[in-house]
Amino acid sequence: MATHSERVNSDIAPTAEAKFNWIDPLGLQGRLSEEERLLSEAANIFCQSKLLPRVLQAHRHETFDREIMREFGEHGFLGATIPEQYGGAGLSYVDYGLIAREVERVDSGYRSAMSVQSSLVMHPIYAYGSEGQRTKYLPKLA
C-alpha cells in the first residue's frame, strides 16, 4: 500500500527545474523605468567605489566617518523625497528605496543613518513644520 506522500507526489506532473536569479531574485530590474535604472546604477557606482572602501576603514578603526553623510547630501541621498525648493532631490519613494538598497548593500549602519536623517528628521519638518521651519532647516539637513 502506498503512503500518503507517495500518493500525493505521484499526482504531480514533473516540471522543468526552476532557475533562481541570484542577481535579481525579485525580478526588480524588469519593473523599473529607465530613469529608475539609471538612478540605481549611479547609486551603486557611488556606493561600491566611494562608500565601500571608507566603510571598511571605518570598521577597522571603529569610527563613524561623518564626511560620508556630507557626501550623501551632495549626491541627493539625504531627504531624497523632499522637494528641491527645500534642498531635497524631489525623488519618488521608489527612487529613495533604490538608493537605500545600494547603501544597504555596503553597510546597514550608514543606511540607517541616511534613513534616520531623511525619514525621522527631515520628513516630519516637511510634513508638519511651518514654511519658515522648512526653509530654515531642510536645506541645511539635505
What are these regions (language model features)?
Residues 1-35:
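Intrinsic disorder at enzyme termini
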Residues 38, 45, 50-142:
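Glycine-rich flavin
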